[in-house]
Amino acid sequence: MKIATIAKYVDQPMILNKLDNKMPKLLILAGGTLGVADSIKTAKKDKKNAKKKLVQNAIIISSTIGASLLGTRGLKIRNKKVFNGLMERVDFSKLQKMQTKAVDKFLDKVQVSDKDVLNALNTAKVKELSPKQIDILTNKLPESPAKEELFSVILPKKKNLNSKEIFSEIKRLSLLGLVPVVGGVGGGIIADRLTNPSKNEKSSTSAKKRIANKVKEGLYQYLANIFLCNVGAGTALFISERLENAKKIKPLTPMKKLVVILSGITATGIIGGSYIANYVSKKCIDPLFGEAKSKKLYSERKPEALDIALHADDIATAGILSGFKWIEPALPFMYFVSGYRAGIGYRNGKKDNEQDKKVRVS
């Protein structure tokens, strides 16, 4: 089976619709599994705080997932749209009507006698095409304006973004990443207030420290793992487009474009992201919460293996900017860990930091 056929298969509007509809369930399942596993781990090491950890995890995970779903899907109350989501969504029934109309219009213009082609066209009216049916339509239908118009609906080509569209998409993707992080920080602060009531000045100072950690980790996750990577991807793609227009480089294929984007992500996000995030925390957030200045930039938060793993969402960003639409429904799932880590106020630099000790509750 050709790679091009697989790419067309997963980028079908009806496949994207199914992936989008399954994402909330997968997100809730993943979040619930993480919360239960972490709570069980805490119970084994610190039974006294096990219940508290369970409550905190439930609040943080719920707020992160809730914010993510609101951001992607928008809000509707009594069938009235309050605000739109950041991801384009089309009802399956509407897709069926659109594809049925496109197929009928094609058959009005072109006579088709091949049974395999007719079966594939009838399938396209109600559900996604199989890889075999995609090959049949691609190879057996002669090239014509009618075929091109049909394929623009049932098998749309990857969109080649121009510079203006690139930065518009970067803005949207950055907002998609920001929403779960804000949800995680907000949920973390609420969870902390509910499970750690301030009884005296000492506990009040400790609570302030925990809030500061959540804000700093939220900033770290957003800048290092999301925003700066998006900026790097967009900038690299913008520069390559300018070079291509000036005939300095050959036209970029989708795979070459992917390499260019990943290079931009590596330069700005993976290499410079943690430095910039920690620098902003030291200069802005620490003074805001009255924390003592530290000479070492990585005294509280240093990059680790999981941070590299979290850059899987940057590969997804690269895929979207390169025109691979099937990746987009998975973005809320990929951003979830960033939101959760922000919510618990994860810190790994100081040995005496309470978030670094797994037996303690964030």
Question: What residue spans do the PLM features occupy?
Answer:
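Glycine-rich, hydrophobic membrane-spanning regions of integral membrane proteins that mediate transport
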Residues: 1-362
